[in-house]
């Protein structure tokens, strides 16, 4: 299907959808969007913050840290990765000073793209999919958000998880906040959602976003 004036419509969609936003969802919970290719959720605990995803680069992670300090006056004590894609983990290095626990879930089946041949194919597909060879004027956006920091030479600062769960569901109380972490494979085999029952807040990672299909 061909779309008339497709670039203009994409530009209008991007301008309407991907402005930097720090939205208070409810008391003690903020949704941060428009800072990159992914979002982050700040959950304020008794003495520290629980952070769901870390954005895609060290530079953007540092900006997120300044927002967290501004909103809460607290440091990050726990990071939860909703899944292993780099745009959700690339900012983790910005939070090392507070020595956070970092939680992730293990994939249930083998991650095939880690094999040599498929990794090369995946990398080439990603280069085309996200328009890394395009200028800002040509790219407009990456569909589900502004361009990743990598497109501007920003450093990804991955930090391995300190706790990896193999279960399908884990419930924990962290900093006085009850968190239900549930495995729900989507873009990846390790994808989880995080439900905060007391706040009635669901952190769904890339299992749901306002752009379909993600081309």
Give residue ranges: language-model regions:
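Active-site metal-binding motif and surrounding structural segment of the metallo-beta-lactamase
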Residues: 17, 25, 47-48, 59-106, ...
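Short catalytic-loop micro-motif centered on adjacent basic/acidic residues
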Residues: 31, 50-53, 77-81, 180-181
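Conserved beta-strand hairpin/beta-sheet module of binuclear metal-dependent hydrolase folds
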Residues: 19-70, 193-206
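Active-site environment of divalent metal-dependent phosphoester hydrolases
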Residues: 59, 84-90, 109-112, 188-190, ...
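Core dinuclear metal-dependent hydrolase active-site scaffold
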Residues: 164-196, 201, 208
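Metallo-beta-lactamase
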Residues: 111-182
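N-terminal pre-domain segments of enzymes
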Residues: 1-19
């Amino acid at each position: 299907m061909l779309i008339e004036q497709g670039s203009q419509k994409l530009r209008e969609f991007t301008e309407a959808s991907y402005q930097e936003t720090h939205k208070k969802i409810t008391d003690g919970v903020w949704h941060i969007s428009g800072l990159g290719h992914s979002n982050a959720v700040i959950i304020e605990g008794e003495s520290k913050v629980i952070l769901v995803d870390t954005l895609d680069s060290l530079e953007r992670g540092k900006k997120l840290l300044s927002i967290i300090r501004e909103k809460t006056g607290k440091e990050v004590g726990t990071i939860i990765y909703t899944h292993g894609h780099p745009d959700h983990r690339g900012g983790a290095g910005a939070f090392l000073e507070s020595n956070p626990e970092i939680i992730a879930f293990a994939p249930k089946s083998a991650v095939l793209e880690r094999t040599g041949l498929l990794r090369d194919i995946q990398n080439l597909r990603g280069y085309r999919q996200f328009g890394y060879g395009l200028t800002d004027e040509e790219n407009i956006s990456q569909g589900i958000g502004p361009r990743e920091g990598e497109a501007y030479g920003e450093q990804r600062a991955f930090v391995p998880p300190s706790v990896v769960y193999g279960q399908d569901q884990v419930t924990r109380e962290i900093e006085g906040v009850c968190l239900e972490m549930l495995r729900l494979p989507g873009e990846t085999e390790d994808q989880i959602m995080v439900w905060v029952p007391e706040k009635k807040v669901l952190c769904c990672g890339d299992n749901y976003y306002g752009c379909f299909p993600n081309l």
